[in-house]
């Protein structure tokens, strides 16, 4: 039995055909001010040998961290970052309503900015730039270098396809 694919390469769809998801990531606790404070406290290295003040505080801060995590999952608060074959989108709520986005032709570089407290998670902010101008920011992205690399690779593919037409 043969199947006919709608695209020449499995999983690859031309941007002008339809928008498809490449990758979705959820912000860490490092996206929130309270989460960054928790990260800063847990990063304190003062101590003796294996034991540090930060590790002790990490144990004491488990309950507030869980509370912040549950808060981040509330329907009016939850967010996710969706990379498609056309743009990068911040989606809000349980249904993933597009809140704001940046098209691939609106930036030429992505910087990783690790704010105090985010390094403990490990997380960082992705700063999308067009020249020296910040055009978009994703807060508290987990393992930001991976998502940055995927965004840039997808952007290159999009712009390459657009130039060839």
Where in the sequence are the language-model features?
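N-terminal basic, Ser/Thr-rich segments that initiate or prime the first beta/alpha elements at protein or domain
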Residues: 1-165
């Amino acid at each position: 039995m043969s199947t006919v694919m709608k695209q020449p390469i499995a999983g690859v769809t031309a941007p002008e055909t339809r928008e498809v998801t490449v990758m979705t990531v959820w912000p860490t606790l490092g996206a929130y001010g309270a989460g960054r404070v928790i990260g800063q406290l847990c990063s304190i290295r003062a101590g003796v040998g294996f034991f540090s003040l930060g590790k002790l505080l990490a144990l004491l801060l488990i309950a507030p961290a869980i509370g912040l995590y549950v808060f981040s999952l509330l329907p009016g608060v939850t967010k996710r970052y969706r990379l498609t074959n056309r743009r990068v989108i911040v989606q809000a709520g349980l249904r993933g309503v597009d809140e704001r986005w940046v098209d691939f032709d609106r930036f030429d570089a992505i910087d990783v900015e690790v704010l105090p407290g985010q390094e403990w998670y490990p997380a960082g902010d992705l700063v999308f730039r067009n020249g020296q101008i910040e055009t978009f920011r994703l807060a508290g992205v987990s393992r930001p270098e991976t998502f940055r690399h995927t965004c840039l690779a997808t952007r290159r593919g999009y712009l390459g396809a657009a130039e060839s037409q």
